[in-house]
């Protein structure tokens, strides 16, 4: 039996993790979400109210909510601790998702606001999360912390494939990767594995309501994707992504070189 804490558990990959992991009644899953009532309702309706799922309020932009979530989690898991802390929650900015960074220059206020929100949520929020939950992780058997990152934070991928879009979001994920590496350096001697993982392209509805102008931006990006990964057929269903990601984090270890690493869903640098 393993204990999992998953942030951003209300939808997308986060809810996919909750659904998949809780299928084994021996596992215990704690999901951190901003809207506790709505997520509890979703769990009851879609997962039959599985008793091995606990939903807690936890907002990456609120230190106090994360502190309370850690305290509540400690009461739930007891001496077992947290085997897997999955830092999945994030702010996926749309502001920079379709255009090059230079095209944002005239939108000064929004650029500053979005950048601040990205850093507070995707970077500082996870620093707080790790600091607050590390005592529980150290109590466990598995001792694994997985940060869900993005290929947009990989410098080689950006430079080698001329990836222009998602500049601010990518910068926040690159910063998260550095944070994870720093935590790894600190806690590796105590047997805690920290690493970052990009889930690849997953069908979670990010592009359901794009405008014609945004489609134009995506077309250029998709052309580069086809050149980078000719085998790529499009975003995969959440269920498939979760299966691949879980297989990677299960085999990941300090001994096999994952400590502080930034890898794809496959455990390498092939992002798609």
Curated annotation (Swiss-Prot):
Keywords: NADP, Oxidoreductase. Its EC number is 1.1.1.-. Iso-A82775C is a precursor for the biosynthesis of the anticancer natural products chloropestolides A to E via a Diesls-Alder reaction with maldoxin. In the absence of the prenyltransferase iacE, siccayne accumulates instead of iso-A82775C and can also be condensed with maldoxin to produce chloropestolides H to K, which show also antibacterial and anticancer properties. NADP(+) binds at residues 13, 59, 88, 169, 173, 202. Pathway: Secondary metabolite biosynthesis. Pfam families: adh_short. GO terms for molecular function: oxidoreductase activity, acting on the CH-OH group of donors, NAD or NADP as acceptor. The active site is at residues 150, 169, 173. It is an enzyme of class 1 (oxidoreductase). Gene3D superfamilies: NAD(P)-binding Rossmann-like Domain. Induction: Expression is co-regulated with the other genes from the iso-A82775C biosynthesis cluster and probably controlled by the cluster-specific transcription factors iacI and iacK. SUPFAM superfamilies: NAD(P)-binding Rossmann-fold domains (SSF51735). Disruption phenotype: Abolishes the production of iso-A82775C, but accumulates pestalofone A. PANTHER family: CHAIN DEHYDROGENASE (ATSC), PUTATIVE-RELATED (PTHR45458:SF3), SHORT-CHAIN DEHYDROGENASE/REDUCTASE SDR (PTHR45458). Short-chain dehydrogenase/reductase; part of the gene cluster that mediates the biosynthesis of iso-A82775C, a enylepoxycyclohexane and biosynthetic precursor of the chloropestolide anticancer natural products. Within the cluster, the prenyltransferase iacE prenylates siccayne to generate pestalodiol E, using dimethylallyl diphosphate (DMAPP) as cosubstrate. The probable oxidoreductase iacF is then involved in the epoxidation of pestalodiol F to pestalodiol F, which is further converted to pestalofone A by the short-chain dehydrogenase/reductase iacG. Belongs to the short-chain dehydrogenases/reductases (SDR) family. This is Short-chain dehydrogenase/reductase iacC. It comes from Pestalotiopsis fici (strain W106-1 / CGMCC3.15140).
């Amino acid at each position: 039996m393993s204990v999992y804490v998953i942030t951003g558990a209300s939808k997308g990959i986060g809810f996919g993790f909750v659904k998949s992991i809780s299928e084994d009644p021996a596992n215990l899953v704690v999901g951190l979400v901003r809207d506790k009532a709505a997520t509890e309702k979703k769990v009851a309706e879609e997962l039959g109210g599985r008793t091995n799922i606990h939903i807690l309020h936890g907002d990456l932009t609120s230190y106090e909510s994360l502190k309370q979530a850690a305290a509540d989690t400690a009461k739930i898991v007891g001496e077992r601790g947290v085997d897997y802390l999955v830092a999945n929650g994030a702010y996926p900015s749309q502001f920079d998702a379709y255009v090059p960074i230079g095209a944002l220059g005239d939108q000064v206020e929004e650029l500053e606001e979005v950048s601040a929100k990205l850093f507070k949520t995707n970077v500082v929020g996870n620093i707080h999360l790790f600091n607050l939950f590390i005592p529980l992780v150290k109590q466990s058997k598995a001792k694994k912390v997985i940060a869900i990152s993005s290929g947009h934070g990989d410098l080689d991928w950006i430079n080698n494939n001329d990836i222009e879009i998602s500049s601010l979001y990518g910068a926040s994920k690159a910063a998260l990767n550095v944070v994870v590496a720093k935590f790894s350096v600190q806690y590796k001697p105590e047997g805690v594995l920290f690493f970052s993982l990009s889930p690849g392209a997953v069908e979670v509805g990010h592009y359901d309501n794009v405008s014609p102008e945004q489609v134009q931006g995506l077309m250029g990006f998709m052309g580069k994707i086809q050149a980078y990964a000719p085998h790529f057929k499009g975003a995969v269903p959440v269920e498939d992504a979760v299966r691949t990601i879980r297989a990677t984090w299960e085999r990941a270890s300090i001994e096999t070189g994952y400590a502080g690493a930034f890898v794809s869903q496959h455990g390498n640098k092939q992002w798609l």
